Amino acid sequence: MCASATRPQPSASNNVKKIILPDLVSHCTFKLRHNRHRKQVTTETKKWLFKDGNLLGQKERAYHGLKCGLLTSMCYPDAGYPQLRVVNDFLTYLFHLDNLSDEMDNRGTTTTADEVLNSLYHPHTWRSSARVGKMTRDFYKRLVLTASPGAQQRFIETFDFFFQSVTQQALDRASGVIPDLESYISLRRDTSGCKPCWAMIEYANNLDIPDEVMDHPIIRSLGEATNDLVTWSNDIFSYSVEQSKGHTHNMIPVVMYQEGLDLQAAVDFVGDMCRQSINRFVEEKARLPSWGPKIDQDVAIYVQGLADWIVGSLHWSFETERYFGKSGRQVKASRIVDLLPRQRLP
């Protein structure tokens, strides 16, 4: 069920100039680590991304401000160089797709999905000159060299879900719909792009975990709790930028609309949900069953990879210029965000 958003959002947000962020960094006690291959991988990914000369001017500046290599390093700290390079290429490319989908109507999203998914499902036979297709085939051919069959399958399936969800997001945007909270959470778990990143944990750490283990309810719950923390905290951190563009695919306006909250109360509401997701992760981790020494060891590495994503994404959000410009560290210390002014429509 979805509610129409053509009615105005709660008026309290129109006059608010600042918000106070929840202190999620202090609530997360996982150890932050870095991968020693970060600088080399960042250099090589930049060459890969820019080799056709298609990212110039503002897009090039946005790439440097993104600091994707730092995110990759924090979230995959134990990966070897070849695997880290593929993961960093993918994450950089994923942010590129995210920017595309944010600006696309439904037709544009579908075209991108066709290019990407055909390149994944048919990497050796699909022929296209589209740059996004060539980039997809390039990193995926490197991934399959060492990824387990299960990791490959989970990567493709979850990336397919990503495109289905961003298509729905584009339709919602075009029709001016704000979904209810339950519908939003379900959709956002796929639009976040997190699920293929969890398959990358398997790949980056050379894991071959049986499908029946990966499908276990506790393993799924751990992935979901991580997805929720990364996604919902991102909704908080990106709110200033998104509201300046009039975007509503964000949990904060959804909560304001459904619960009748003012802006700061909605931020606090989502912050509480983020804390609960970290708590849920810790509780579910303590409930993990045993599948025998070898599988237990691989599962422990996978679960550690999820924890690395929780702590890494939180700290990276204040290092990248994507959300707070060059003021990220100041915002991290004060937790005060000056909201950007609304952009005028052309």
Swiss-Prot record:
Name the residues that bind Mg(2+) 2: 98
Indicate the enzyme's highest-level EC class: lyase
Q: Where does Mg(2+) 1 bind?
A: 98
Protein residues bound to (2E,6E)-farnesyl diphosphate: 322-323
Marked site, Plays a critical role in the stabilization of intermediate cation, at: 95
Keywords, alphabetical:
Lyase, Magnesium, Metal-binding
Tell me yes or no: is Metal-binding among this UniProt entry's keywords: yes
Sequence motif: DDXXD motif, positions: 98-102
Tell me its cofactors: Mg(2+)
- Catalyses which reaction(s): (2E,6E)-farnesyl diphosphate = delta-cadinene + diphosphate; (2E,6E)-farnesyl diphosphate = alpha-muurolene + diphosphate; (2E,6E)-farnesyl diphosphate = gamma-muurolene + diphosphate; (2E,6E)-farnesyl diphosphate = alpha-selinene + diphosphate
**Enzyme Commission code:** 4.2.3.-, 4.2.3.125, 4.2.3.126, 4.2.3.198
Q: Which GO terms describe its molecular function?
A: metal ion binding; terpene synthase activity
Q: Does the keyword DNA damage apply?
A: no
- Briefly, what is this protein's role? Terpene cyclase that catalyzes the cyclization of farnesyl diphosphate (FPP) to various sesquiterpenes, including alpha-muurolene, gamma-muurolene, alpha-selinene, beta-selinene, delta-cadinene, alpha-cadinol and delta-cadinol. Delta-cadinene is the major product of Agr1.
Q: Which family does it belong to?
A: Belongs to the terpene synthase family.
Q: What is this protein called?
A: Sesquiterpene synthase Agr1
Q: Which organism is it from?
A: Cyclocybe aegerita (Black poplar mushroom)
Q: Which gene is annotated as encoding this protein in its UniProt record?
A: Agr1
